[in-house]
């Protein structure tokens, strides 16, 4: 699957335990998507457009109103990256 650099970064942060919080306006449309890493840092590459592409491809999902997390398909799509911890 073709995944852009920004989508790859977001998926990698989610695969390591991060989550995406969304804020909706009065009409129920998503206007802000915030990616939070496991350590609590905010990922600047996660925009609403990136969020919509990941959700459209079913690489992320929300369960029972909780924040969005990576799915099994997302784990298979993400490329391995060296972890500099």
Curated annotation (Swiss-Prot):
UniProt-listed InterPro entries: YjhX_toxin
Family under the similarity heading: Belongs to the UPF0386 family.
Designated name of the protein: UPF0386 protein Plav_1374
Organism: Parvibaculum lavamentivorans (strain DS-1 / DSM 13023 / NCIMB 13966)
């Amino acid at each position: 699957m073709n995944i852009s650099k920004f989508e790859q970064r977001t998926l990698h942060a989610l695969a390591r335990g991060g989550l995406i919080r969304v804020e909706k306006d009065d009409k129920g449309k998503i206007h802000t998507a915030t990616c939070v890493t496991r350590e609590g840092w905010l990922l600047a590459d996660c925009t609403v457009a990136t969020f919509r592409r990941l959700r459209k491809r079913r690489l992320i999902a929300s369960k029972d109103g909780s924040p969005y997390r990576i799915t099994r398909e997302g784990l298979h799509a993400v490329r391995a990256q060296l972890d500099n911890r």
